[in-house]
Amino acid sequence: TKNGPVDFQPREPYSPLFTAIEHTDQMVEFQVTQEYLGHSNHIAYLAPMWKEFFEFVPANSLKAVAGVANIGTDVNWCGHPFAQSNWYAFGRLAWNPSLSSEEIAEEWLKQTFTTEAAFVNPVKDIMMDSREAVVDYMMPMGLHHLFAWGHHYGPEPWCAIPGARPDWMPSYYHKADKVG
């Protein structure tokens, strides 16, 4: 079951299936790739999002954790060096969901770059703020699916493609248009 009920949006509630289905083993599916979070063009550290999920759905109620990674042909497989931190965070939280996002970010930075506090501390702060920064401009006012046609890099609430499926258009979900 996907962690949220929509489709790996920058912010969405956890899927109600996790608490509604009591007698069925479940596995959560997280999206490690940054499809709706700027692909690999933006720093979007996802551990805080996954920690939010585990605050509502106890890890011991799950049988497994899966991740959609979508590696590419880039030298580092991820496109952006900081996208690798999400792979690391996914593995660490799958193994031990009680770890904090900050602990994981610090571990990854020290193992990847340097142990120097002058680097680790400010970059960890950037990582910890990154997902909220992406949410703020990808989902202004909490509105989701505002993405441009043909890519998910940024908002395009005015998008209207003749003949396209209505549920693929930004205004379908929130009914906002140029008049309000």
Q: What is the predicted function of each stretch?
A:
Residues 1-68:
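Active-site capping/gating regions of soluble enzymes
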Residues 61-69, 73-180:
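C-terminal non-catalytic alpha-helical accessory regions
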